[in-house]
Design a protein with these regions (language model features):
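Short, aromatic-rich membrane-interface segments at the entry and exit
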Residues: 34-42
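Non-transmembrane, membrane-adjacent beta-strand/coil modules in membrane-associated proteins
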Residues: 70-138
Length: 165
């Protein structure tokens, strides 16, 4: 089986939130008259933006035996044997979830969240649609959001093949 990859791009909502927050930071930067507080603000938010961007997914890949969540800093590999179920959630809203650690809004959603409906979940999504909930045997639940909705169908077929073999 060949490797299937789907990009992970921001939808309009997350792009708008990122642009608005960035614009507010620029306004705040110029509103501070003193150099050192301005430098501290710039340094702090530069680090925050770089960290958040680095952990947000850029793509998802299905290899012969694993699902890969690719980000600039880290590649998370989940063995297909480890996945017990995958469920297509479609359009969802991370803002209805409780963020326990991570980021929501700037460059998408990344981190640990809690949902009364789903429970604890690790969210790696740059968009609010095409959400796929992945249940693993020992690593908890993940939500991913590939750009290509057919990625879910390919994941399901590989999970079925994996279980038959």
């Amino acid at each position: 089986m060949k490797t299937i990859t789907s990009t992970s791009s921001m939808d309009r909502t997350n792009l708008l939130i990122t642009l608005i927050l960035s614009a507010l930071l620029v306004v705040l930067f110029f509103a501070i008259p003193d150099f050192y507080p301005r430098l501290i603000l710039f340094s702090l938010f530069s680090v925050v933006y770089v960290v958040i961007y680095g952990y947000n997914p850029t793509s998802y890949s299905l290899t012969e035996d694993s699902l890969l969540l690719n980000s600039p800093y880290k590649k998370i590999s989940i063995s297909l044997n480890e996945i017990s179920a995958a469920q297509y959630l479609g359009k969802s809203n991370a803002f209805s979830m409780i963020r326990t650690f991570g980021s929501s809004g700037i460059f998408g959603h990344w981190g640990y969240f809690y949902s009364p409906r789903i429970g604890k979940v690790k969210l790696y999504a740059r968009r609010n649609n095409h959400w796929i909930l992945i249940h693993t045997l020992h690593r908890g639940k993940y939500i991913i959001a590939p750009d290509d909705p057919s990625f879910f169908d390919e994941l399901q077929s590989r999970l079925l093949i994996e279980k038959v073999e």
